[in-house]
């Protein structure tokens, strides 16, 4: 089961939100998603990820990404925050960046083999072919790729 919502604020960015059930525990889903450097393994849009800084607990605090677009690629960095008690990961690009990219992934316990994923993505620019393929609802496309990755992994 999935539900999706996309809406425009008074000005950009475009926010899209989606929720879906996953066939793994919330803790497992959180840990897999929180491993940001592994994002290229499950998100085809992302070509590479490199840890630039770490939090004291060892988790990545800043990750540099390269994403493929229709006619080239774009590099960007995201700052990550983690809340292991709430099973929530948030990210935001640098304020000096030419684009806005931020979001949140939250995982809610349903059972030992199921969880609910709540995902929000804020972007201020279309992301090429991916945006077209997802009918402008990029969050749904990202969550579908993550769910498929979990299915293969677990």
Where are these regions (language model features)?
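Hydrophobic pocket/interface hotspot
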Residues: 28-33, 39, 63, 80, ...
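Generic structural detector for well-ordered beta-strands
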Residues: 19-23, 50, 81, 106-108, ...
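Glycine-rich portal/gate segments that line the openings of hydrophobic small-molecule binding cavities
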Residues: 40, 51-95, 145-153
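Generic short beta-strand segments
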Residues: 3, 64-68, 120-124
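Hydrophobic ligand-binding cavity/cleft-lining segments
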Residues: 1-58
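Short, surface-exposed coil-to-beta transition loops
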Residues: 15-17, 62, 73-77, 99-104
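Beta-strand/loop substructures that line and gate deep hydrophobic ligand-binding cavities in soluble
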Residues: 92-148
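Short strand-connecting beta-turns/loops that link adjacent beta-strands
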Residues: 25, 56-58, 85, 110-114
């Amino acid at each position: 089961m999935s539900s999706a919502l996309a809406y425009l604020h008074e000005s950009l960015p475009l926010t899209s939100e989606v929720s879906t059930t996953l066939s793994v525990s919330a803790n497992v889903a959180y840990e897999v998603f929180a491993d940001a450097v592994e994002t290229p393994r499950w998100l085809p849009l992302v070509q590479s990820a490199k840890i630039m800084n770490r939090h004291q607990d060892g988790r990545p605090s800043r990750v540099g990404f390269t994403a493929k677009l229709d006619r080239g690629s774009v590099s960007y960095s995201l700052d990550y925050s983690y809340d292991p008690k709430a099973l929530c990961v948030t990210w935001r690009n640098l304020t000096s960046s030419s684009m806005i990219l931020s979001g949140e992934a939250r995982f809610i316990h349903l059972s030992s083999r199921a969880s609910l994923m709540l995902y929000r993505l804020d972007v201020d620019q279309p992301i090429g072919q991916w945006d077209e393929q997802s009918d402008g609802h990029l969050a749904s496309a990202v969550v579908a790729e993550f769910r498929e990755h979990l299915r293969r992994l677990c």
